[in-house]
């Protein structure tokens, strides 16, 4: 069996035609595309200028919500309409709480990036969210160590400031791939 969005399990043999088979498998990954595109754009901007544009996050969240609605209707699982935004908001609130523990460690852009990526990861369910947070921790620590060691901007205003959006986005990709393929 193949694990689809939100834990729906279907056998490839259960589809009534090759077309439905292809749509189901392709749609699984297309559903995450809005957050992926937004995440890549935001990561590049965070690396270059240490800012996460809120407008880009808003557009990415809106596009991902549309994808969530489409998937929920196609899979006939309206719980997805609650699950994805709930995990996204909970993750963003947790990230905001963590950033308040040590002020200056993470900015509001990292919190909004977590919200946008949380919509995609939240579609994959609780296991994906847990894997995402573990991957965020591990990749974040590795990214921080590498960035501080090889900082290409060490002679600029941004010296010593680590952009965390790439770690958040990479962890989201790892979590979605790990939980949908396994």
Where do the language-model regions lie?
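A membrane-topology feature that recognizes alpha-helical transmembrane segments
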Residues: 1-182
């Amino acid at each position: 069996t193949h694990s689809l969005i939100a834990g729906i399990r279907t056998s490839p043999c259960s589809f009534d035609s090759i077309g439905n088979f292809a749509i189901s498998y392709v749609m699984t990954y297309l559903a995450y595309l809005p957050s992926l595109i937004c995440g890549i754009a935001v990561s590049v901007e965070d690396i270059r200028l240490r800012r996460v544009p809120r407008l880009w996050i808003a557009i990415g969240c809106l596009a991902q919500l549309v994808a969530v609605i489409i998937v929920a209707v196609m899979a006939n699982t309206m719980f997805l309409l609650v699950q994805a935004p709930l995990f996204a908001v909970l993750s963003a609130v947790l990230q905001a709480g963590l950033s308040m523990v040590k002020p200056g460690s993470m900015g509001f852009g990292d919190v909004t990036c977590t919200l946008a990526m949380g919509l995609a990861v939240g579609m994959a369910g609780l296991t994906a969210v847990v894997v995402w947070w573990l991957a965020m921790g591990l990749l974040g620590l590795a990214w921080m160590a590498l960035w501080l060691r090889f900082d290409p901007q060490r002679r600029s205003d941004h010296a010593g400031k680590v952009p965390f959006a790439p770690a958040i986005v990479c962890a989201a990709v790892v979590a979605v791939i790990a939980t949908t393929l396994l």
